[in-house]
Each structure stands twice: as C-alpha cells, then as structure tokens.
C-alpha cells in the first residue's frame, strides 16, 4: 500500500507546485481533452454510425450526444420479438479491464423498455442517477422506477418499490424489485437530488458517500454499475471517474506518474463528452485531492496536518463560480481540503419542481419571500430571471430537509452555471401549450380599468 500512497502524495505535491498557475493549467488541460475528442471523431477512431441511423434517431435524448460504435451497449434480450439492439449507452472499462460501467442517457418515454432490457441482460445491481426528472423547467429523465403502492409495468417487466430512504440530505436510496418472466431480482438506485446540470455540487462529500454506498451494495460481483444523468456524459463522467480513481486507490494501483488528465481521456474515448465542462473537470481535481488527502491522513501518522499541506487547488467550492476579482479578497487561512462551508443560496417558498405551467415568479420589487424550514428568505427577483414553475410537492420528503428552490437546488447548496443550452438541445415540457382557445395556461384575465356602472344603478 505504501507505494500507492507515495504516488498519491506525489500527485498532491505536483498540484501544490503549480501554485497560482493552477487555474490556467486546468483550463489548458481541459482544452486539450476537447481537442483530442474532436480529433478522434474526425479521424473515425470514435464513430457514431448506429446512433445516426433513422430508426435510432428518436431514441436519442439529445441529437449531439450519440454513443460511440466501438464501445456501445448492444442489446440482445427480446430481439426475437422485434425489439432493436440499440440503446444510447456505452461500456466503460474499470481498473482491471473489465466492463465496469454502463454510461447511458436518462430514459425517454419510448425507451423505458430498452432501459430495463439493459439492466436485466447485464445483471445490473446498482443504478447511479445524477439528475432529477425535471430540471430548470425541462424534462431530463423519464421516471423508470416505481413509487409507493404504484408498481410500474413496461413490457414484460414489472418494477415494484420495496423501500426508499435518504442516505444523506442529497442522496435518495431506493430498493426495487424487478420481475421478468416469473424471475425476480433486487435492484438498488442511488439518486443525487441536487446536482445542477452542467454544474457541480458544493462539496464532494455526499458524492463520495454515494460512490462508497454503491460499491457496498454491489459487493464483489462482476456486474457493471449503470450510471446516468440526463445526457449520460457530464455528471455521469464525473461519477465514473471518481469511482475509477477510488478503485485504483483501494487496489493499490495508483501509478507513480498518476494523471487525472489521462484518466479523463480514457473515459472520453469510451463515452462522448464524459466530464463535459471545465468546471466539472476542476471539481474532479478537487474531489480526487480530497480523497487522496483523507487516505494519507488515515493511513499513517507521518502525514499529520496533511490538509494544510495539500495543494491550494481551491479555497472552497465557491472558487468554481466566483469572479477572479473577488478571489483577490483576503480569505481566512486553510487549505483546499478543509471542511468546506459554502454559503447557501437564497431559499424560495416554492417546493420541488415537477411541473411547468408558465407561471412567472414575483416581479422585481415585490419584496422578500417566505422562509421554508431553516432556509433563508429569498429576495425579489427580476421578471427576466423568474423561471416558469408551478409548486408541486414531491411524494417523498426527507425528514427535516430544506425545501428546494425552483431550480431544484437545496438552499444549502450553491447553484452552478445553469445557462440553458441551445435551441433543440432539451425536451421542454412547457412547449406544448396551445396558442388558440382556452387551456390551462390561457385563462380569461380579469377586466382592467374603470367600467361604466350597471344600468340598474341609474334607474330612478
């Protein structure tokens, strides 16, 4: 184990040696990763022929995220009944070269059966989900699991919820019973409820707990972990990479020249856009540094005060989204891997967002909002910033938890960059409103302005 620990410490020392150049170095590395990905596609090293076929196009959630042919998951179960072999998913190899992960998109309404065919055929025991059903007012994943006393039937698969509980304030753990042709299996699902799309969590702690619990539930079996978010690339890639590095550490396989850049390149060659943004790449460095520091600190008394000696990659998670001018403000002493405390974003009176009805938030100057639980009150927001949301309370509420704001982010979490993607990139559940006639979004408005009094009032 000492050799692996020495490699981990060497990695941290290299980070520390970068000093103030850290931001520029990571930006350059991520730019190189993007360039390599583009070159692989241009040279045909990573092709997407299957996903581009007319019969498969509608099975892709996003038209620009197609599975690589070289590593794509090929379904054989139920093919004799006329079902296709296609699903938007790729295998990713683990530290021992086995097919350790299936990185896939969040199911669409018409690909639910394909998703469960995948789970059943490859013996998946644990599913890691890094998104919500609705995010920023857009449908990001079809619900493929059962709810309490509401079994889900899709094709020949019957899914029943056995129990659900909160692993921590961010992670929901569900135990599902899946029955197919009179055979039943248990499948566990871990859902990260507050990871913003194209952003990062405020701290790695709960994500590391999620990965650790997934491995505990998985046991020593060879079955792959099924990992997905909405597109199955950005957040999915972060989870796969963190677990991959953790397995390197546990199996004492950290090489002396360990490079997170090389690990992400491996992921990218197997699943398109794995670790999708520079912010996610920075967060990945933060997470791995914390993992290594904790391991060194627990393994040997010679590594005392390791947190203070670690590379100052970030003062805290706010570094990822703080303007450079603000970073010049003096901060209290402490290294990157101290206990991270991030100021919470303003709470909102709205509950979790599960429906979009084009109801505007309060206009600017409307005053502060109400408090929910122990969350802070929300200030007035401009009409341009007000999202389209309706207040719909979720079925399961974690005990004593904060109400989440309209963007699906906990008041104790700092929302990351949530800028919408280009037109056509997402499935918008608000796009089906009728433009003529009356409907839920087109009600008769209250008459405005003074009106003449009724004729009866003027009679003598």
Swiss-Prot record:
EC number: 3.1.3.48
PTM annotation (Phosphothreonine): residues: 393
Tissue specificity remark: Expressed in brain, colon and several tumor-derived cell lines.
Biased composition (Gly residues): 364-378
The entry's keywords: Cytoplasm, Hydrolase, Nucleus, Phosphoprotein, Protein phosphatase
Active site positions, chain numbering: 229
GO CC field: cytoplasm; cytosol; nucleoplasm; nucleus
Protein's GO biological process: blastocyst formation; negative regulation of ERBB signaling pathway; protein dephosphorylation
Modified positions (Phosphotyrosine) in chain numbering: 389, 426
The protein's role, per its UniProt record: Differentially dephosphorylate autophosphorylated tyrosine kinases which are known to be overexpressed in tumor tissues.
Chain residue ranges for the region called Disordered: 361-460
UniProt organism field: Homo sapiens
Cited CDD domains: PTPc-N18
Annotated localization: Nucleus; Cytoplasm
Lineage: Eukaryota, Metazoa, Chordata, Craniata, Vertebrata
InterPro entries: Prot-tyrosine_phosphatase-like, PTN12/18/22, PTN18_cat, PTP_cat, Tyr_Pase_AS, Tyr_Pase_cat, Tyr_Pase_dom
A Pfam family reported for this protein in Swiss-Prot or TrEMBL: Y_phosphatase
Ranges annotated as biased composition (Basic and acidic residues): 449-460
Stored SMART domains: PTPc, PTPc_motif
Domain called Tyrosine-protein phosphatase: residue spans: 26-291
Reaction equations catalysed: O-phospho-L-tyrosyl-[protein] + H2O = L-tyrosyl-[protein] + phosphate
Protein name: Tyrosine-protein phosphatase non-receptor type 18
GO MF annotation list: non-membrane spanning protein tyrosine phosphatase activity; protein tyrosine phosphatase activity
């Amino acid at each position: 184990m000492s050799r692996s620990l020495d490699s981990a410490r060497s990695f941290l020392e290299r980070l520390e040696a970068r000093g103030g150049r850290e931001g520029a170095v990571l930006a350059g590395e991520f730019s190189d990763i993007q360039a390599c990905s583009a070159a692989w596609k241009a040279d045909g090293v990573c092709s997407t022929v299957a996903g581009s076929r007319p019969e498969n196009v509608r099975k892709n959630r996003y038209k620009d995220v197609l599975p690589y042919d070289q590593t794509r998951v090929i379904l054989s179960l139920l093919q004799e009944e006329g079902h296709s072999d296609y699903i938007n998913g790729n295998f990713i190899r683990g530290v021992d070269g086995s097919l350790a992960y299936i990185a896939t998109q969040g199911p669409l309404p018409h690909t639910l059966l394909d998703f469960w065919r995948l789970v059943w055929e490859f013996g998946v025991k644990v599913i890691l989900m890094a998104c919500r059903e609705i995010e920023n007012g857009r449908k990001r994943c079809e619900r493929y699991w059962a709810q309490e006393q509401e079994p889900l039937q899709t094709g020949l698969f019957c899914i029943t919820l056995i129990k659900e509980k909160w692993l921590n304030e961010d992670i929901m753990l569900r135990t599902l019973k899946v029955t197919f042709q009179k055979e039943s299996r248990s499948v566990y699902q871990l859902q990260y409820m507050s990871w913003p799309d194209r952003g990062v969590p405020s701290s790695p702690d709960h994500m590391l707990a999620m990965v650790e619990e997934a491995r505990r539930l998985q046991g020593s079996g060879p079955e792959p972990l099924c990992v997905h978010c909405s597109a199955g690339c950005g957040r999915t890639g972060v989870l796969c990479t963190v677990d991959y590095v953790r397995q390197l550490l546990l199996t004492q396989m950290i090489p002396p020249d360990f490079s997170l850049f090389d690990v992400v390149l491996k992921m990218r060659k197997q699943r398109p856009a794995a670790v999708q943004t520079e912010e996610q790449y920075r967060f990945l460095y933060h997470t791995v540094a914390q993992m290594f520091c904790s391991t060194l600190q627990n393994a040997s008394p010679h590594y005392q005060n390791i947190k203070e000696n670690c590379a100052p990659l970030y003062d805290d998670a706010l570094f990822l989204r703080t303007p450079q001018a603000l970073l010049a403000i003096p901060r209290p002493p402490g290294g990157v891997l101290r206990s991270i405390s991030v100021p919470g974003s303003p709470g909102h009176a709205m509950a979790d967002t599960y429906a979009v009805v084009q109801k505007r938030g309060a206009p600017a100057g409307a005053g502060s909002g109400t408090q929910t639980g122990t969350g802070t009150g929300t200030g007035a927001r401009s009409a341009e910033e007000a999202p389209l949301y309706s207040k719909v309370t979720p079925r399961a509420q974690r005990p004593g938890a904060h109400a989440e704001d309209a963007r699906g982010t906990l008041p104790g979490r700092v929302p990351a960059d949530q800028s919408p993607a280009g037109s056509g990139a997402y499935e918008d559940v608000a796009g089906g409103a009728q433009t003529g006639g009356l409907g839920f979004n087109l009600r008769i408005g209250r008459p405005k302005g003074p009106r003449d009094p009724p004729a009866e009032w003027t009679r003598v």
